[in-house]
Amino acid sequence: MIKIAIIGASGYTGVELSRLLCNHPQVEITAVTSRQYAGVALSEVFPNLRGRTSLICENLTIEELCLRADLFFAAVPHKTAMNIVPQLLAAGKKVIDLSADFRLNSAAVYEEWYQEHSAKEFLSQAVYGLPELYREQIAKTQLLANPGCYPTSIILGMAPLLRAGIIKPQSIIADSKSGTTGAGRGAKVGSLFCEVNDGFKAYGVGRKHRHTPEIEQELGKLANTDFNITFTPHLLPISRGILSTIYADLNCEIEADEVQALYEEMYKDEPFVRVLPLGSAPATQYVRGSNYCDIGFAIDQTTGRIIVMSAIDNVVKGAAGQAVQNMNIMCGFAEQEGLEIVPLFP
């Protein structure tokens, strides 16, 4: 049994962490923080938790928090995390940061895309928390950088191809669609019902989305070379889910069954990656509420391109579920503990 605290429990990621951890047999949630809802029951803020938790949201100092828990989920905005993580690490605590503050290896790249980094010395200590690629490192780390939602779907979709060296890395085009929870719970005009309902739009077009360097960093490691991709995110009028359609030029002649074998071999022991039968395509409704990533592909022999499709729930495998999966690895628990959830359909 481990005592955990959720810093920033009033956002979508925070409530999803609470939902998942309420079902975890090895976890005791000892604190949930929220400045906005301090003194309010978490189940009052999120009625879906009624009868499952009696926790009260609190506005605690780091010193007070360190007396409560051994492992911390930092579900706070960028810049905020880098201000609190060093204090938690200095107290000997384990930290899973769900912001982007420790995902990028280079402080210069982070500052180009986000803002000044005030804890640069910790970047080299952080492990990128994609279990399918970094399980051994995750098991040993004190500071884990939980991946972004779009990067998770794209990296898992492309990893077998890049490892096998059968595509031209610089040809990759990632076309991703996300539900509105990806924009967070804060009030924004672009997230209002009338702005989103019955519509579908691209945003962050032309190398403007902050997940771009994260995707390139990890794909570059898989390919053993630095390169740039074209990444265009879109906003869907649904609550949760990401579908990434990723295109790349093949650099050799290869049959679909050979590519299928590459995917099946890489992910055969992965509990949360489901490689679909040849000819099948993933869909967001079949991973909803779960920690699964469903992957399918097709080859266009006329153009010499492969089209990979990857579906995840952006709030689960794209955020809170992956964080719990990482916690399990860091703490030596069974990796599926608390996450063996059948996707919600319809």
Swiss-Prot record:
Annotated keywords: Amino-acid biosynthesis, Arginine biosynthesis, Cytoplasm, NADP, Oxidoreductase
Annotated GO MF terms: N-acetyl-gamma-glutamyl-phosphate reductase activity; NAD binding; NADP+ binding
Please name the pathway: Amino-acid biosynthesis; L-arginine biosynthesis; N(2)-acetyl-L-ornithine from L-glutamate: step 3/4
Q: Does the keyword Ligase apply?
A: no
User: What single Pfam family name could you report for this chain, choosing any that match?
Assistant: Semialdhyde_dhC_1
The coiled-coil regions, if any, are none
Q: Which Enzyme Commission number(s) are listed?
A: 1.2.1.38
Keyword field contains Amino-acid biosynthesis: yes
Q: GO:BP terms for this protein?
A: L-arginine biosynthetic process
Provide the reaction this enzyme catalyses.
N-acetyl-L-glutamate 5-semialdehyde + phosphate + NADP(+) = N-acetyl-L-glutamyl 5-phosphate + NADPH + H(+)
Instruction: Spell out the GO cellular component terms annotated for this protein, sorted alphabetically and separated by semicolons.
Output: cytoplasm
Alphabetical list of PROSITE patterns matching this protein: ARGC
Where, by residue number, is the active site?
149
Q: Which InterPro entries match?
A: AGPR_AS (IPR023013), AGPR_type-1 (IPR000706), NAD(P)-bd_dom_sf (IPR036291), NAGSA_dehydrogenase (IPR050085), Semialdehyde_DH_NAD-bd (IPR000534)
Compartment(s) where it occurs, according to its Swiss-Prot or TrEMBL record: Cytoplasm
Family, similarity comment: Belongs to the NAGSA dehydrogenase family. Type 1 subfamily.
The function of this protein is:
Catalyzes the NADPH-dependent reduction of N-acetyl-5-glutamyl phosphate to yield N-acetyl-L-glutamate 5-semialdehyde.
What name is this protein filed under? Answer: N-acetyl-gamma-glutamyl-phosphate reductase
